Regions:
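Catalytic cores of carbohydrate-active enzymes
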Residues: 7, 105-223
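Solvent-exposed loop and edge beta-strand segments that line ligand/cofactor-binding
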Residues: 13-24, 91-103, 158-182, 225-229
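Hydrophobic core segments within long, regular secondary-structure runs in both alpha-
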Residues: 3, 30, 34-37, 50, ...
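Single conserved hydrophobic/aromatic residue that forms the stacking wall/gate
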Residues: 1-5, 9
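Hydrophobic, small-residue-rich alpha-helical packing segments that form membrane-like cores
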Residues: 60, 87-111, 115
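Hydrophobic or amphipathic alpha-helical targeting/insertion segments
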Residues: 19-50
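The substrate-binding groove and active-site-proximal loops of carbohydrate-active enzymes
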Residues: 13-20, 48-58
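Core alpha/beta catalytic barrel or barrel-like domain that forms the active/cofactor pocket
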Residues: 6-7, 43-51, 75-89, 211-214
Length: 229
């Protein structure tokens, strides 16, 4: 985990060795570190000094805060996290657009971090990140909910991906699964979202990532529209 933390950049626009960032990468590190500390009991790990990938150094705990603050800052016009170079689904063209998945992942990571901060007695950080979590949750529920499910994101041109009016790519798995897994969705919305996943995405062979399948290329949405159904 400390090796992974050293891949966090003090300059936060550099990931994967290029001058831009994948919006989800660093966020996965937060719950990984928290779970590592829980399992091992190595509380002192949070204060271990590790270098940043570009220059300088900081504690693992400071790296975690830097990650959360970066995602809080890198948001679009609606307040949803920017997709930057890519999120988990590299086939979506979210450069300049906004990612529902990353906002839900951000919310999940914040709450994992709060648990650690509470255990360490860092009350100022608990207060700061509880406020951040409340804001992220409110934005997600206000901006991403569409009738019976959560949309997948918003392109740089303002087109919403995965809405009730879309003929193709109407429902996407990642945003709805993570709305529930993260705890950001209310019970009512979470149940509706999972009912929609069952209705549109569940098959005898597993759950599809989106449906109905894309058949018409749309470069505003991305390469996902060019992948064979």
């Amino acid at each position: 985990a400390s090796s992974a933390a050293s891949d966090v950049y003090k300059r936060q626009d550099i990931i994967h060795g290029i001058e831009d960032a994948c919006s989800d990468d660093a966020l996965w590190l937060i719950p990984s570190i928290v779970e590592y500390i829980k399992e091992t009991g190595e509380i002192e790990f949070a204060d271990q000094i590790v270098p940043y990938a570009d220059k300088g150094e900081g504690t693992v705990y400071e790296h975690m805060m830097r990650i959360l603050d970066f995602s809080a800052k890198e948001v679009g016009a609606t307040g949803i996290c920017l997709g930057l170079r890519a999120d988990w689904n590299d086939c979506l063209n979210l450069g300049g657009g906004e990612s529902a998945l990353v906002s839900f992942l951000h919310y999940w990571a914040i709450n994992n971090f709060i648990e650690l901060a509470q255990y360490l007695g860092r009350d100022d950080d608990v207060k700061k990140y509880k406020e951040m979590a409340t804001h992220v949750k409110d934005v997600c529920n206000n901006e991403l909910w569409d009738k019976d499910w959560f949309i997948r994101g918003i392109t740089k041109n303002g087109k919403k991906i995965g809405t009730s009016t879309d003929k193709e790519g109407k429902v996407h798995l990642e945003s709805n699964a993570w709305a529930v897994l993260s705890g950001a969705a209310s019970e009512e919305k979470g149940i509706k979202a999972m009912d929609s996943v069952k209705e549109y995405l569940a098959t005898p062979y597993g759950i599809m990532l989106n449906a109905p399948s894309y058949t018409v290329p749309d470069d505003d949405i991305g390469f996902i529209t060019r992948v064979y159904p």
